[in-house]
Design a protein with these regions (language model features):
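N-terminal "assembly arms/tails" that initiate or stabilize quaternary assembly
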Residues: 1-71, 213-224, 230
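Short, solvent-exposed amphipathic alpha-helical segments in soluble enzyme
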Residues: 102, 171-175, 252-253
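Extended oligomerization regions of viral-like shell subunits
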Residues: 39, 137-140, 144-229, 240
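Short helix/loop capping segments that flank catalytic or ligand/cofactor-binding pockets
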Residues: 53-56, 95, 165-168, 245-247
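Extended, compositionally biased alpha-helical segments that mediate assembly or anchoring
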Residues: 227-259
């Protein structure tokens, strides 16, 4: 049996197809590719917030305070996220699905890595909401804390461990939209799609829009193949180079249940 070797461009397309099928990162994070045009391995990210300053005034009165713009600046280091899949010719000869299965696993690991990074950034949210148990009011109150007029684009990420409790608590308030198909999707509440992610710890949830977290891509999905002809050992490398950062602290609410 001749050995089946993928060209790198074919391999890259296969991995990208898997990534797009498993999860659409654009739904939960903003993708920024400006790093690819700039030299250097560090990026300074400013996270902005504003103070309230609108007041009810009587005739002749003026404002007693200003609306202020504040920001915190943090330097991030660009990192390489890489997965390696290895197998021997004999393994593929015994089971032709070895390569496709390995690529699927590498893509899932990449997804899990970026999801975990995004959740870690969301956990830095300045807007928080605490509740003793799940309920319709938990989501409604969290939305109110965002103080936004247009709720389109909101999502709620929860832990799979809390899925049963959420279903029981929300009951008829949890509706299903056939137009919203995502891995882990369990329904809508207050018009917001609820999706599970293994990166979310039990007892926590994150309500937000994709403007909260930005993925700064230095290099998009890159693949590389290496083979030792003597031992018939094959290695496929899948990598992305970039930074995941919280860029708008007012576009995400950290919900803590059981507080």
């Amino acid at each position: 049996m001749a050995h089946n070797i993928y060209e790198n461009v074919v391999l890259s397309n296969k991995v990208n197809e898997i990534l797009e099928t498993k999860v659409n990162l654009n739904s939960y994070m903003t993708i920024d590719t400006t790093l690819s045009a700039n030299a250097g391995n560090k990026i300074k990210v400013n996270t902005y917030s504003t103070t309230s300053g609108v007041e009810a005034l009587s005739m002749g009165e003026g404002n007693t305070k200003d609306i202020e713009v504040n920001f915190t600046s943090k330097e991030y280091e660009v990192k390489t996220y890489q997965g390696r899949f290895a197998f021997y010719d004999e393994q593929e000869q015994a089971d032709p699905m070895v390569v496709d299965t390995g690529l699927d696993g590498a893509a899932k690991d990449m997804i899990n890595q970026f999801n975990a990074l995004a959740i870690a950034e969301m956990d830095k949210a300045t807007l928080t909401h605490e509740a003793t148990a799940w309920g319709f009011d938990v989501v409604a109150d969290a939305i109110a804390k965002m103080d936004i007029e247009n709720e389109a684009g909101l999502f709620l990420l929860v832990s799979p461990a809390d899925q049963a409790a959420i279903r029981k608590a929300l009951k008829d308030n949890l509706s299903y939209s056939e137009g919203f198909v995502r891995t882990g999707y369990i329904g809508n509440v207050c018009g917001v799609p609820v999706t599970t992610s293994k990166a979310v710890p039990s007892g926590k949830a994150y309500l937000g829009t994709k403007e909260a977290v930005t993925v700064f891509i230095k290099k998009d999905t890159e693949t590389e193949y290496d083979r030792d002809a003597d031992t018939r050992a094959n290695k496929y490398f899948v990598r992305k180079v970039g930074v995941v950062a919280l860029t708008n602290a007012y576009k995400v609410v950290k919900i803590t249940i059981g507080a």
